Amino acid sequence: DLARRLESSLPMQRHDFVLRFMKGRFDSRELAVAAAMSVRLDIDKPYYGMVLCPEQEQNDQPFTMQEEPLNRVTGVTVCSVEMAAMNNFLYVVFADTEQGLHDVANALHQICIERYGHACVAMSNAHQNFTHAPACYLEAATAYDNRFVMDDSSVLEYSFVSVNLRDI
């Protein structure tokens, strides 16, 4: 009975982990990895980044890695939470390569285009230091905030948005 209750609380524990990670509540990589392992997430990968994707009326849950084409992306661990106040979903992507981050963001973009006819998917730069998670989130949020002035035909990348902001 206890095992069943613990198992049923796993989604909430993962949600809590993602929010704590995003806010930079872990003083070291080791502490973050241990906390993630306690909720059965393997985040001990060289790169991570954050992706924001809008919530749709037809979809009030984040996409899962079992959905096509996300299920074809390898070498990544993806955790997601609803950011209710902002009306979007945050995906924290831990990856073996920087390309894995792009693959997840592009897959999310493709899903949104196919299901809703439009997509606004924004991503941070790739990071390695887990203590930089708050800055990583701000990068994704900055890219997302530029959705009104940028074309949403592809993923809005912070590196691209920040270069264009300097030109304004």
Residue spans for each PLM region:
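Conserved short beta-strand edge segments in small beta-sheet-based binding/regulatory domains
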Residues: I113-N125
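Interdomain helical linkers/hinges and coiled-coil/dimerization scaffolds
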Residues: D1-V104, M123-F148, D152-I168
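Extended Gly/Ser/Thr-rich low-complexity repeat segments
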Residues: H102-E114
